[in-house]
From Swiss-Prot:
The lineage of its organism: Bacteria, Pseudomonadati, Thermodesulfobacteriota, Desulfobacteria, Desulfobacterales. Keywords: Ribonucleoprotein, Ribosomal protein, RNA-binding, rRNA-binding. One of its GO terms (molecular function) is structural constituent of ribosome. PROSITE patterns: RIBOSOMAL_L21 (PS01169). GO terms for cellular component: cytoplasm; ribonucleoprotein complex; ribosome. This is Large ribosomal subunit protein bL21. Belongs to the bacterial ribosomal protein bL21 family. It comes from the Bacteria.
Amino acid sequence: MYAVIATGGKQYKVGEGEIVRVEKLPGEVGDTVRLDQVLLFSDGENVKVGQPTVENVAVDAQIVEQGKAKKVLVFRFKRRKGYRKKQGHRQPFTALKINKIEAGA
C-alpha cells in the first residue's frame, strides 16, 4: 500500500512505516500530523488517481525530527573587479514517520 502526497509544494511517494523528509512543518517532535492532500492511492490491487486529490484518503504521520539540511554554499564573483560574495544556506526540514494510510477517512 502506498500513496503520493503533496506538501510544501512537492510530491512524495510514501508507504506505511517509511521515514520521509519533507519541507518544514509546524509542530514538535512526537506530534502527529494528518496529511489529506493525497494525489494517488494504491492498495496493491487498485489505483485511485485524484483530480486533483483523492477523496476520503488521508495519511497519518508522526514528527520524528525537526532539523536543517547540509549547508549549500553560494559564491558569486566578477572577474578582475575584486567583487566576491560568499553566502551559505541551510534548508529546514521535518522528518515524518508514516504510521497509517487511511482509505475511507
